[in-house]
């Protein structure tokens, strides 16, 4: 009787140890599979959906552990990290994606933080029309930047050639603003919140890509097609958390600002410009179903045709993968977030 009892206890212990071992293996497997690293090229409000989804537990709700990293170094750096496999998702500009695909990468735009532009062309109050810019010095950050593209698109909309103005590389928006104030340049392509500062000191907006309905993929979320294909379930769950982050951002101003102040290290009492920028992102820039714009992609292709001749005939959709967002819209998932 004693031997049978001992044998039963031993057998039970063995089964328990085996069960615990299986649970540990499964937990370890899930933990490894469910980690996602997201990279940003800069500290920006365009990062809000990911930051908010992290802080509010939206990713955790879908069994995902995220690590959001600000890499810096411009749009190409975060894109390179995605291509190398160091990041699963990255935030970058549409032009960088087009260049990468033409260079042989299997990268694709899977969502958009902002299909239009965060820049505005700021001028002195006495500049009444675009024609008054002829021969004037217009400041941009660098040639080939999103601000440069925004300027070229605005000039095209006004039926003006780039040669009709002087395009000058000045540096970041704050530096351009100082140059504008001192008369070093006559106009400047500034981004938020610097164009608010310019408005507050007497300058005015002559060109606004949003008001002019100009799309050029200011900020997009990318992933490799290979990763999306082999990690379909995980990528889909990530996108659920992402669109919940978008919805919370658009619908909950106070809470969103609190999170953004923390992430962007803005001291309390100094959030005036952040709040004004929030208004633009919540109502004009971010969309409930954040599809990358085919129209914006076409625009980018038109301007890259000199560098890549095949851009003239390229299909904009070859740079886009809507397979993560479309099921969420078609199923009504996104709609329920706004009810």
Predicted features and spans:
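Bacterial Sec-exported substrate-binding components of ABC uptake systems
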Residues: 30-34, 336-339
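Ligand-binding clefts/hinges and TM-proximal coupling segments of bilobed small-molecule sensing domains
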Residues: 146-161, 165, 241-273, 320, ...
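Short, glycine-/small- and polar/acidic-enriched structural segments
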Residues: 34-182, 186-192, 205-209, 214-215
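Bacterial N-terminal signal peptides
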Residues: 13-27
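Pocket-lining segment of extracytoplasmic ligand-binding domains
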Residues: 174-266
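Conserved C-terminal helix/tail region of periplasmic/extracytoplasmic solute-binding proteins
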Residues: 301-339
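N-terminal secretory signal peptides that target proteins for export/translocation
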Residues: 1-11
